[in-house]
Amino acid sequence: MIVAGVDEVGRGCLFGPVWAAAVILKAEAFDRLPALGVTDSKALSAKRRQALLPEIHSHCLSYGLGQASAACIDAVGIRAATELAMCRALQRLCHSPDHVLVDGSLPLRPWPGSQETVVAGDSHCLAIACASILAKEGRDALLQRLDQRWPGYGLASHKGYGTKAHRTALLQWGPTPLHRLSFLAPELKGGSPAGASSGNLE
């Protein structure tokens, strides 16, 4: 039976897409990766996550990434957008899973196949832990690039979360097209930066 683990990152951010990864591991991964310290991405430093990436890639039978944009989040809500990102990640796997392990307590409603929720799955399930690392590193790399486009917001440091520095930048500059307006308090929704263009509803 082919089992995939799926996890998301960026659900609580004020900026940018919610990102997901799905992973199907090779049999030998279950000995090798725990010995290397693979666990929940939140428990690992950025340097350690980056060091683990090639090991995770080499021990995957298949992996896929998916995202849903800030515009999509504003349109359909964070839960539906997160489900969309997860389904996109699963659909990009090279092998169709017989069963999906979903991090958290909420089922993946659009997924038509067999699935199981795993509370704190990124700490207790190796495939979900690997997915959490791939999702985190993928989204962080995107935020590093977007920091160059909007350098005044500190995106490379806070990764879109609602830190004091991020909120101060919003008060000064207003939201970019990639901010989630539905997540912002009224006082943070001022004018958009000069030259801004609308984000895609994906």
UniProtKB/Swiss-Prot annotation:
**What enzyme category does the UniProt record give?**
hydrolase
This protein's major location comes to: cytoplasm
- Binding-site residues for a divalent metal cation, renumbered to this chain: 7-8, 103
Q: Is the rRNA-binding keyword given for this protein?
A: no
Q: Which residues form the RNase H type-2 domain?
A: 1-195
Compartments where located: Cytoplasm
**An individual GO BP term:** mismatch repair
GO molecular function list: manganese ion binding; RNA binding; RNA-DNA hybrid ribonuclease activity
Record's Gene Ontology CC terms? Answer: cytoplasm; ribonuclease H2 complex
Q: What keywords sit in the KW lines?
A: Cytoplasm, Endonuclease, Hydrolase, Manganese, Metal-binding, Nuclease
**UniProt remark on cofactor binding:** Manganese or magnesium. Binds 1 divalent metal ion per monomer in the absence of substrate. May bind a second metal ion after substrate binding.
InterPro entries per record: RNase_HII (IPR022898), RNase_HII/HIII (IPR001352), RNase_HII/HIII_dom (IPR024567), RNaseH-like_sf (IPR012337), RNaseH_sf (IPR036397)
Record-linked Pfam families: RNase_HII
Which top-rank group of organisms is this from?
Answer: Bacteria
Q: Which reaction does it catalyse?
A: Endonucleolytic cleavage to 5'-phosphomonoester
Reply yes or no: does the keyword Transferase apply. no
Q: Which cofactor does it need?
A: Mn(2+); Mg(2+)
Recorded E.C. number(s)? 3.1.26.4
Biological function: Endonuclease that specifically degrades the RNA of RNA-DNA hybrids.
Family to which this protein belongs: Belongs to the RNase HII family.
Q: By what name is this protein known? A: Ribonuclease HII
Name the gene. Answer: rnhB
